[in-house]
């Protein structure tokens, strides 16, 4: 138990430090691939491992964007950049996110940033053993509405366990009838999203983040090797195809990834965008539930 808590606290300390550093380098003209490489490299330098590929979701893009191989995307003036990063220490995960405005953004963007940040603060203040999950969603929704914004209703926070980023319990961002009670020792990622749009996300066709699902009979020897490396390196945690390029030839890797997706050996995460094309802000912390409150490990 002591080792587990120490690992969570170390992972939280790492992502907090890297989040602050990365927020400071986000600027007009910065290639996204430079940002994600910086974040992931710094996590390793600080003694952790990336728990998932660094997400850099800009404007209406809401989640699951990381640089694919050869990404030429660049951050621009007026962009609203959501930076979502995670680290693990021996499989124990800390997950955090921040929204950074680049240059001149309008007042609505600042309002939605304030809404998401305050919703996170208010949600954390309600968390303790015995609190119903639905109560957290109510607090988040009411806070975001008080700023004249809408929560993103079909994205949620989540519980985490060792090597498992989403371990089964969803933490809603809206008021819903969920009477599940939090328990002491639960590890939760609380992540409100605020927007002036309709508050729904939809899939985009792109998939740049993946996760191991199961062993499958595979015709291609190379695909079997790729799947073995995925299982060995990342367990059940999300990974990016660009992470595998140091091990495999790019052309054969592309063919293997297609086969692994088709055989359902790995799960592809679609990039998500706000349905009405509106800007979105996000804030996130990881907490450990206690009898009379919680410890925020990513402050």
UniProtKB/Swiss-Prot annotation:
PROSITE patterns: MAP_2. GO terms for cellular component: cytoplasm. GO terms for molecular function: initiator methionyl aminopeptidase activity; metal ion binding; metalloaminopeptidase activity. Substrate binds at residues 64, 166. A divalent metal cation 1 binds at residues 84, 95, 284. Its EC number is 3.4.11.18. This is Methionine aminopeptidase. Binds 2 divalent metal cations per subunit. Has a high-affinity and a low affinity metal-binding site. The true nature of the physiological cofactor is under debate. The enzyme is active with cobalt, zinc, manganese or divalent iron ions. Most likely, methionine aminopeptidases function as mononuclear Fe(2+)-metalloproteases under physiological conditions, and the catalytically relevant metal-binding site has been assigned to the histidine-containing high-affinity site. The keyword Transmembrane does not apply. The keyword Manganese does not apply. PANTHER family: METHIONINE AMINOPEPTIDASE 2. Belongs to the peptidase M24A family. Methionine aminopeptidase archaeal type 2 subfamily. InterPro entries: Creatinase/aminopeptidase-like, Met_Aminopeptidase_Type2, MetAP_archaeal, Pept_M24, Pept_M24_MAP, Pept_M24A_MAP2, Pept_M24A_MAP2_BS, WH-like_DNA-bd_sf. One of its GO terms (biological process) is proteolysis. NCBIfam families: met_pdase_II (TIGR00501). A divalent metal cation 2 binds at residues 95, 158, 191, 284. Pfam families: Peptidase_M24. Monomer. HAMAP family: MetAP_2_arc (MF_01975). It catalyses: Release of N-terminal amino acids, preferentially methionine, from peptides and arylamides.
């Amino acid at each position: 138990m002591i080792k587990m808590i120490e690992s969570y606290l170390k992972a939280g300390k790492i992502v907090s430090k890297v989040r602050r550093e990365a927020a400071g380098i986000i600027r007009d003209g910065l290639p996204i691939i430079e940002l994600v490489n910086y974040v992931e490299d710094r996590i390793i330098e600080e003694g952790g491992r990336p728990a998932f590929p660094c997400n850099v979701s800009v404007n209406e893009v809401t989640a699951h964007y990381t640089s694919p191989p050869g990404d030429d995307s660049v951050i621009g003036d007026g962009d609203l950049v959501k930076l979502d990063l995670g680290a693990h220490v021996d499989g124990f995960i800390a997950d955090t996110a921040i929204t950074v405005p680049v240059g001149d953004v309008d007042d609505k963007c600042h309002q939605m940033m304030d809404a998401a940040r305050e919703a996170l603060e208010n949600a954390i203040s309600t968390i303790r053993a015995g609190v119903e999950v639905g109560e957290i969603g109510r607090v988040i929704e009411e806070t975001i509405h008080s700023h004249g914004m809408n929560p993103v209703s079909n994205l949620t926070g989540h519980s985490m366990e060792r090597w498992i980023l989403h371990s089964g319990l969803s933490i809603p961002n809206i008021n819903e009838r969920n009477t599940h009670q939090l328990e002491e020792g639960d590890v939760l990622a609380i992540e409100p999203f605020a927007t002036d749009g309709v508050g729904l996300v939809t899939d985009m066709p792109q998939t740049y983040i993946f996760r191991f699902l199961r062993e499958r009979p595979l015709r291609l020897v190379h695909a079997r090797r790729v799947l073995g490396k995925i299982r060995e390196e990342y367990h059940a945690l999300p990974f990016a195809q660009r992470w595998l390029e140091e091990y495999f030839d790019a052309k054969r890797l592309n063919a293997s990834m297609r086969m692994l997706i088709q055989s359902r050996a790995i799960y592809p995460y679609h990039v998500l965008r706000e349905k009405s094309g509106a800007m979105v802000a996000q804030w996130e912390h990881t907490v450990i539930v206690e009898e009379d409150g919680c410890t925020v490990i990513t402050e």
